[in-house]
Amino acid sequence: QRQMCIRDSLSAVDARESRRIKARVEAERLPRGADPARHVKLGRGGLSDVEWLVQSMQLKHAGQIEDLRVTGTLPALRAIARHGLLPEAEVAVLEEAWLLATRIRAALLLWTGKVSDVLPTNMRDLEAVARLSGVGTTGGELEERYLRVTRLARQVFETRFYGL
């Protein structure tokens, strides 16, 4: 079992540096020409946003709340909810976005045979990903749900991460 390095809290300087690094990651890591609304890993409201927010909250509160000393995103989100660090509705949005992005990534791998982090625009590929992921019955339904959920997750991320 790995040991976690726990501080009493996240300093204002550390929080500011974390926000600066996240902004840099967003500016530099998204592949050139990629639509940030469709990139399930690095795009708006995707895996990266949820994980950055969760890990920042762990850094800020794990010194006082032992339940936050976990390595998984979903167990940490559930601990955040249990301890009232975020409203249940916001936790539900973040969890749905993370699960949806994870299912889409797995379905893309099954469909294409390679790792891909971009929600397809081609309707045939969208239909296949919808079926394989179990999310919706049509490509349009999958696309609409993903774009809606990640838009909401990004709103939570921006409010909470930049408000730390």
Which stretches of residues belong to each language-model region?
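A nucleotide- and high-energy phosphate-metabolite-utilizing enzyme signature
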Residues: 1-3, 7-164
